[in-house]
Amino acid sequence: MARLRVVGVRHHSPACARLVRAVIAAERPVAVLIEGPSDMTPRLGELALPHQLPVAIYSYCLPAHDGDPDAVAGSGVVAQAGWSPFCAYSPEWVALHDGAAIGARVAFIDLPGWHPAFATMSNRYGDRDHQVSAALRDAAHRHGFDSTDALWDHLFEQPGDDATLGARLGAYFAALRGEAEASDADRAREDFMADGVAWALAEADAGGGGTVVVVCGGFHQAALERLVAARTAPPAPPRVEPPAAAIARTGSYLVPFSFFRLDSFTGYASGMPSPAFYQALWDDPAGAPETMAMAAVTRLRGRGQRVSTADAIAAVELSHGLARLRGHAAPTRCDVLDGLAAALIKEALRAPVPWSARTTLARGTDPYLVEIVAAFSGDRDGALAPGTPQPPLVADLAAELAAVGLAWSRTPTPIRVDIFAPDAAARRRVLYRLRWLGVPGVQRVQRADLRRGRTQPVEVWQLVEDDRTAGAIIECAVWGATLAAAALARVYRHLQELTGVAELAAAMEDALHAGYGAVVDQLRERAADAIAREPQFAAAGAALARLAALHVADPTRGLAGLLGQVLDRALWLLEGLTGPTAALDAAVVDGVVAIRAALEFELPDHALVAERVDAALHRRVEAA
């Protein structure tokens, strides 16, 4: 008969990764089931490729912008995206590879990352349950620890008796779950996972028995054991169908990740901190404290901070002394950090050290502490193995760049685009579409200037490729399969967030340069309504300057009427300003400067417009 072994883990814990490895080696299970996005199970071969860790599964759901609005709204689908990150010491990563190595059936059994259960969860392997547990916080403070992270390291990330690790973790996770009521999202996930486990047990029974190992977050361990015990196996593995293409676009892809991103999740999305420290602990448990102390010293010296050899030795000695004082067999993360702070910081601190609580660094944090924390975060960047499947957007974007003679560079290199050149429109379309997508490294350094008397018809851009670029482009696949479709979807999403006329005018200008003239046509009525409601003179002035530039760039768009409306509104708001200091307010000055900039374009009825502006300004000066 098949036997179930549920291994509860804390995500990204070396101790839990060791436990998973030991259980799989001892049990030789017929199946290894892992808390992870089940839609990736048929594609587990992608995770077996020789990637440079860390990597992550990126999952997304985006409501269709070009479908039936009523159908989309009625579906309840919301825009969401999230990651399931893996590093070498992730228990889930160890389970994937060790399970496959012994020939076990390996599968992810959790809901896909695009499911509504993850609508508010950007990191599947976050630490929300550890952070909100009152029982664990009370236990930490009762035993003299600043945080549950320090308590965890004290209890588990220590050399010790691995034979009792599973039992000790079980007691810890029971306290973690306690009597707390699971959320609707947790219940949906646990119900789905229980079906997957029940099916795997039935399959194992049919095949002659064996052990089925489940690796899941400790918060779910007891609930899964209880649910599976009372569950009848379904006839097939559970599956969730994605929304219809007319309602939403969903998908999951591998992306390169980094220690910085792993450590930069905030709030309930954050996982275990200081990934470089735990990587060192996984690679060399005995040498990790000294390795990380010297990594911090090296980083400080590289940033021009003076650290003597005596101070470096003192930091290591203090770490070991604190470990002995706190009853640790080897220095923990906090022992090493406290030792570094005690040895290297010579002046009184204005606030508690950052690792005493789960928070972001505050402004004014001592520069030594900033660099020490950065050293423990680490600068390792992941990379996908050659041949890893990628969304169609990646190939389409590369083809679009090549077609217009553009290429990424590793250093800032000016790309000059003469907007009157025959190929300018095509090149600008690609550049502005990349800008709409927010791909890192895409920067417009200089705008073209078509104002009268100072025509400078050259835009200057940079396309700087770094370790974030490949992953960012894959993540942009949430918006569409081609550069044109993805950027247009991003335009429509951006427009949903805009209300002010200045923002609308800026969006219209950038949409036109990206080749979406139809968007400009669609926005004319909305912009007219926004003009009529605009209460701020500076915003009306800024909109006038933008619309003037847009009109000069493409006089066929029929924007003369809008220009007249926004000019009337701006002048009316200007004359309505009162008070002796109103003319000196920064917003008023900005508005006047914007009107002046607009007048430097060749506008319809330019002489009449200039005369009206001049008269309004004179009246305002006389009234001040």
Protein language model features and the residues they cover:
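Compositional signal for N-terminal targeting/processing segments
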Residues: 1-624
